[in-house]
């Protein structure tokens, strides 16, 4: 039989445990940024592009729970990586269009030697977000591609419209490209179904927040994807295409993260013939 003292001790321990988890998931982890460094093998990558770096930021969700100061911190961390390119993979605000101008202003401080590129997410107003970012020198790609040159060598940077809120068209996006390497920005990883049959080499996606809440030994109980937790976060190989799903830096629905730290990813491109 459990004594009154044992019951009280157990109850107090339970309450303290719940409070500790709550404090961690609400106050600590949502601001505890993880920086990942990942090498990506690209078939037939021109020699002049070997070692090119791309920093990815995703799912900023600027709102009262993701304030400007935190975005400033993320921008400083990206700039400290000295990337050649910055890729922004959608969902810049959450809940209100009033935050569009301020997130664009903060992102205008990003420094990249060869450009800052973006695609839209399902929370982004197309016209207002595209206009605000373009005004700050950020190129928004909507079912289109551009060549990126280093002397006579080049590859393609492409971006698609959002799978849910837009009109994603991979055929239009790639129309007119040749057999040179293709790097694709895409908000929703579910779009890999449409992409994996193309000759896109590398896809950067977001959207999932890594589930935002992950349970030890189980993983994320909820992921907003038709595939469940299959593409929750990390590196995936689909046919000849490599896809990386970034956990993002913001939050949605609830201002918490648990075992799904906000993430900035730095990719280094190398020829697929080179050792990893």
Locate each region found by the language model.
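Core catalytic region of metal-dependent phosphoesterases/phosphodiesterases
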Residues: 63-149
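Catalytic metal-binding/acid-base residues of hydrolase active sites
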Residues: 61, 93, 123-124, 145, ...
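Active-site neighborhood of phospho(di)ester-bond hydrolases with catalytic His/Asp-centered motifs
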Residues: 57-58, 86-90, 115-122, 141, ...
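Binuclear metal-dependent hydrolase catalytic cores centered on His/Asp/Glu-rich metal-binding motifs
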Residues: 128-131, 135-138, 142-144, 150-186, ...
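N-terminal secretory signal peptides and thylakoid transit peptides that target proteins
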Residues: 1-18
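N-terminal signal-anchor transmembrane helix
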Residues: 29-80, 96-99
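Conserved beta-sheet core of the metallophosphoesterase superfamily
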Residues: 189-268, 273-274
């Amino acid at each position: 039989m459990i004594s009154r003292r044992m019951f009280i001790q157990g109850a107090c321990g339970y309450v303290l445990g719940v409070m500790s988890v709550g404090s961690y998931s609400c106050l600590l982890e949502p601001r505890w940024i993880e920086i990942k460094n990942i090498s990506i093998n690209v078939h037939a990558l021109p020699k002049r592009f070997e070692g090119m770096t791309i920093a990815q930021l995703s799912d900023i969700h600027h709102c009262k729970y993701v304030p400007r100061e935190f975005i400033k911190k993320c921008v400083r961390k990206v700039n400290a990586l000295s990337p050649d390119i910055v890729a922004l993979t959608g969902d810049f605000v959450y809940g209100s269009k009033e935050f569009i101008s301020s997130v664009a202003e903060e992102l205008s401080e990003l420094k990249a030697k060869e450009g800052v590129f973006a695609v839209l997410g399902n929370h982004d107003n197309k016209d207002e977000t595209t206009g605000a970012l373009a005004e700050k020198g950020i190129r928004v790609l909507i079912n289109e591609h551009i060549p990126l040159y280093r002397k006579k060598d080049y590859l393609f940077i492409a971006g698609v419209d959002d799978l849910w809120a837009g009109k994603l068209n991979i055929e239009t996006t790639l129309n007119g490209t040749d057999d040179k390497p293709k790097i694709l920005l895409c908000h929703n990883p579910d779009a890999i179904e449409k992409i994996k049959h193309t000759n896109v080499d590398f896809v950067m996606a977001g959207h999932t927040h890594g589930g935002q809440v992950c349970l030890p030994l189980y993983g994320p109980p909820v992921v907003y994807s038709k595939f469940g937790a299959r593409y929750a976060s990390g590196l995936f190989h689909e046919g000849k295409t490599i896809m990386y799903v970034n956990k993002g830096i913001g939050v949605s629905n609830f201002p918490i993260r648990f075992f799904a730290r906000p993430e900035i990813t730095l990719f280094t491109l190398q020829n697929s013939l080179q050792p990893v």
